[in-house]
Amino acid sequence: MSNNEFHQRRLSATPRGVGVMCNFFAQSAENATLKDVEGNEYIDFAAGIAVLNTGHRHPDLVAAVEQQLQQFTHTAYQIVPYESYVTLAEKINALAPVSGQAKTAFFTTGAEAVENAVKIARAHTGRPGVIAFSGGFHGRTYMTMALTGKVAPYKIGFGPFPGSVYHVPYPSDLHGISTQDSLDAIERLFKSDIEAKQVAAIIFEPVQGEGGFNVAPKELVAAIRRLCDEHGIVMIADEVQSGFARTGKLFAMDHYADKPDLMTMAKSLAGGMPLSGVVGNANIMDAPAPGGLGGTYAGNPLAVAAAHVVLNIIDKESLCERANQLGQRLKNTLIDAKESVPAIAAVRGLGSMIAAEFNDPQTGKPSAAIAQKIQQRALAQGLLLLTCGAYGNVIRFLYPLTIPDAQFDAAMKILQDELSD
């Protein structure tokens, strides 16, 4: 059956709200290569939206999941617990850069992790308010939609949203927003909208994902830490997209001296299996009463088995170092192109969490059309890219960190050709 035939079936069988970017259907995948039902091959620089830092079907991961399949697939951890969940929590506790002794709880999706981080913060503080940042993305459930700082397409027609959620600008040199602007906005909130002692949490992405890979300045993170300490507010770092070697360190927060109280994680945690988590200060994590946290599939044993292997792969294959090496090569390609491509307004990121932002050279305004044109032309040449950003004018690069050098070089050649065309 052809891609077009599957496409027609999709239109009839699934709602339009489940938007689909590609007009082809996956048949198989291995490492950084994706093959469709017609045999066409693509270099995958989307990786299921940052889920596959260890590549499609890493042999070690496949073996671990197969082994777990032979034992048991589900008990519901809250009913019958299992050792692998506890051991994974111990590993994350030892690795995560959070304040004090750590504890970890596992869930299923990134949105679920963020929801539970907010629950934990509210339980700990007894306060309702949450401050988030414009351009941030935290999920598609009602609380996480409220936290998300982008309207289209995530919020259209779905309101009203939960209350006691407030937004402040995220720093951006390109768009003229300084760290001081962000901090002044928080202080204005305290004066005009919600008193500081009613704020449970401040949540931020150290590198914004959907927002366009804007990197939080160290001064901002330090100031958030000071504000949280001063007012008894829980500091939450959302590492759903930035975690597990993507930024050249295991977590993006490893780039900063200041530690959050809670961190959320998901996506590449289990290499394609659905698993998320919240790790944080043990005193804060223990605030909810027994039974207050959990979920039927939370910490599923198949996904937990995969996560154990992901941590091993990152260490064994030096993927943090690999992320820095590949990211520098990508940055060099983009910076070189910027000299002759005036539409490239900025190149930014950490490690292999790199993005390029595009403006109309004539007006200087954000141009989603230019980003989409490059994306579509690259796809026609077999390179799968994603766009993002508040204006849809950013191309983000999320290749598996296990991609072979020759394949990465081939992708760079396609990118160079399409940027200069």
Give, region by region, the residue ranges found by the protein language model.
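Conserved N-terminal phosphate-binding loop of PLP-dependent enzymes in the Aspartate aminotransferase
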Residues: 1-421
